Amino acid sequence: MRSIIADSKRLVVKVGSSLVTNDGKGLDHAAIGRWAAQIAALRAQGKEVVLVSSGAIAEGMQRLGWSKRPREIDELQAAAAVGQMGLAQVYESRFTEHGIRTAQILLTHADLADRERYLNARSTLLTLLRLGVVPIINENDTVVTDEIKFGDNDTLGALVANLIEGDALIILTDQSGLFTADPRKDPAATLVAEANAGAPELEAMAGGAGSSLGRGGMLTKILAAKRAAHSGANTVIASGREPDVLVRLAGGEAIGTQLIARTARMAARKQWMADHLQVRGHVVIDAGAVEKLTAGGKSLLPIGVTDVQGAFARGEVIACVGPDGREVARGLTNYSSAETKLIHRKPSGEIESVLGYMLEPELIHRDNLVLV
């Protein structure tokens, strides 16, 4: 089996905290130097690379003399602010040794949820790549809140892959890849060499959480691969402990788990809707509506809605949940939650008699609806 990275030109590489720190006690300068050298080798092959790097909070903890990761958000943000300075400096120094300039970009979900800022971020990243710069991206932990944070850099890496229409996302971790079960508990567990991104059985295999230093377990990596597939990006989950792992992947060696994007690439606007707009509420839909959305490519009509949950305004994103509780789609609603509660289970022809007006016959038009 040949590595999918060999034929990929535009890469997003995500490096976890454990691979750039001394067991959480500050940055591992030598390790960062090795990552810079490998990325320089990829650049020499004509590949474009965007790096998503953890490590700011761990470095901040070291500089502040803290041995345990704080729980209070203000202390985490303070550690991130202190540590981000050191992280950027070390990367700049190590890449300069190879004649490569770097750029620091800090993002929040709010940056990408706003369409204009999303397009600006995309334009900036593409310009940096055109100029031969390696963008180094992290979540802006200093200002982020629970409502607008990505939650982990695996998710951020996937969103960046979507943003720049990357060919592949490489998630480097301290694990060898995805196993059929937890290899620490099940001696019969085997490595999943290749699978389809988004295959439902992968989430069951992924299981538990990550370490206390980082925020991402294997499940977040599987979900990140599913998200990256929205734009057609394949994903590799591999051990960053493997010597020259990036160079070997680029050379065609199959390492870790390859998750292939089999689904059709989403249109850019729908991809943005699916990835970056915050869900404000939910509607439960019947089996007939699920069938029409998933197989028929139809709009969601009020008659197919059986329940309305949460408070949302017209034009906000709501999730469509089937009778089994699984989300099947999300989209921009034409009616508020208060209006939807009045018109759900009713034919579109009765909307005007119930509300006194009819904005649209659909609750969500198919052009504003994305299957998930």
Curated annotation (Swiss-Prot):
Q: CDD domains from the xrefs? A: AAK_G5K_ProB, PUA_G5K
Which keywords describe this protein according to UniProt? Amino-acid biosynthesis, ATP-binding, Cytoplasm, Kinase, Nucleotide-binding, Proline biosynthesis, Transferase
Which Pfam family, giving just one, matches this sequence? PUA
Residues that, per the record, bind ATP: 14, 173-174
EC number(s) reported in the record: 2.7.2.11
The name this protein carries in UniProt is: Glutamate 5-kinase
Q: What does the entry list as the binding residues for substrate? A: 54, 141, 153
Give the enzyme's main class according to its UniProt record, as a single word. transferase
SUPFAM superfamilies for this protein = Carbamate kinase-like (SSF53633), PUA domain-like (SSF88697)
Q: Which organism is it from?
A: Burkholderia multivorans (strain ATCC 17616 / 249)
Q: Which PROSITE patterns match?
A: GLUTAMATE_5_KINASE, PUA
Question: Its function?
Answer: Catalyzes the transfer of a phosphate group to glutamate to form L-glutamate 5-phosphate.
Provide the protein's localization: Cytoplasm
GO terms in the biological process aspect are: L-proline biosynthetic process
Q: Where is the PUA domain?
A: 280-358
